[in-house]
């Protein structure tokens, strides 16, 4: 256990993949998973941690097959993916509001009265007031992943830590679901991730974190208490630093 009862990190950026929101389903949002995620985030807010969230959209739209079949272009496919993140963000916002957590949904794309436009200045102000900010539509541009969007938003809001929630409990030297002898890393440097091609995030995302010296934590969001353990500075998942 950590020696202090105070959170180690005061402001974080949490990246939630669309696949994580789908739970054991092939597609869609698992209500139980969404509810549990909102509870975990509410616990952090109760401790005074300022929370920004970037959500993916892979549980609602996967464009690779449509693009492969030539039915939609890459730009259109990426834009469809951005809209999928908006739907996930709406669900996350309402799940948090249901727990009496003030939450702002901010989009990199202009979507009229549905979502307010993203502004780093406004986001920092909301976070400082104790509100959760859910960032959707990625970077607003095609060809950039939501992992890159998460690192970009984390840097912009001056987060102390960027967390990537996955379905495994950290980073391994090879796929633990395929290889019994896979070895988990407790600590890594960004250069190690790049040199060993560990696939933590895409190249652009990792380079952003490295160049701006923002640490990254990879952990299993489905493990009870894992998110809280990370925030309290306990050993959980894999910590990546410069």
From Swiss-Prot:
Q: What does this protein do?
A: Catalyzes the reversible phosphorylation of UMP to UDP.
Note the PANTHER family from the entry: URIDYLATE KINASE (PTHR42833), URIDYLATE KINASE PUMPKIN, CHLOROPLASTIC (PTHR42833:SF4)
Q: Which Pfam families match?
A: AA_kinase
Family statement? Belongs to the UMP kinase family.
Q: What is this protein called?
A: Uridylate kinase
| One GO molecular-function entry | UMP kinase activity
Cellular component, GO, one term: cytosol
Q: What subcellular locations does the record give?
A: Cytoplasm
List, alphabetically, the CDD domains matched: AAK_UMPK-PyrH-Ec
Q: What species is this protein from?
A: Acinetobacter baylyi (strain ATCC 33305 / BD413 / ADP1)
What keywords tag this UniProt record?
Answer: ATP-binding, Cytoplasm, Kinase, Nucleotide-binding, Pyrimidine biosynthesis, Transferase
Query: Which InterPro entries does the protein's record reference?
Result: AceGlu_kinase-like_sf, Asp/Glu/Uridylate_kinase, Uridylate_kinase, Uridylate_kinase_bac
Record-level GO BP terms: 'de novo' CTP biosynthetic process; UDP biosynthetic process
Q: What gene makes this protein?
A: pyrH
Tagged with keyword Cytoplasm: yes
Per the record, what are the reactions this protein catalyses?
Answer: UMP + ATP = UDP + ADP
Q: What is its main location?
A: cytoplasm
Query: Where does the chain bind UMP?
Result: 57, 78, 139-146
């Amino acid at each position: 256990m950590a020696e202090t009862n105070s959170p180690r990190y005061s402001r974080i950026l949490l990246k939630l993949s669309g696949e994580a929101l789908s739970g054991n389903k092939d597609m869609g949002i698992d209500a139980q998973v969404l509810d549990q995620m909102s509870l975990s985030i509410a616990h952090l807010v109760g401790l005074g941690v300022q929370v920004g969230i970037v959500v993916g959209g892979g549980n609602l739209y996967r464009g690779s097959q449509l693009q492969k079949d030539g039915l939609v272009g890459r730009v259109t496919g990426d834009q469809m993916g951005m809209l999928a993140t908006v739907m996930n963000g709406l669900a996350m916002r309402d799940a948090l509001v249901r727990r009496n957590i003030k939450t702002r949904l901010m989009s990199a794309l202009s979507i009229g009265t549905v979502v307010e436009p993203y502004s780093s200045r406004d986001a920092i102000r909301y976070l400082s007031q104790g509100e959760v900010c859910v960032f959707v539509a990625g970077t607003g541009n095609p060809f950039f992943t939501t992992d890159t969007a998460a690192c970009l938003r984390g840097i912009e809001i001056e987060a102390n830590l960027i967390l990537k929630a996955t379905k495994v409990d950290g980073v391994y030297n090879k796929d633990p679901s395929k290889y019994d002898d896979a070895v988990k890393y407790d600590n890594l440097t960004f250069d190690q991730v790049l040199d060993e091609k560990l696939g933590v995030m895409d190249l652009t995302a990792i380079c952003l974190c490295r160049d701006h010296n923002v640490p990254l934590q990879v952990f299993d969001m489905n493990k009870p208490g894992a998110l809280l353990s990370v925030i309290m500075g306990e050993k959980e998942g894999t910590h990546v630093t410069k």
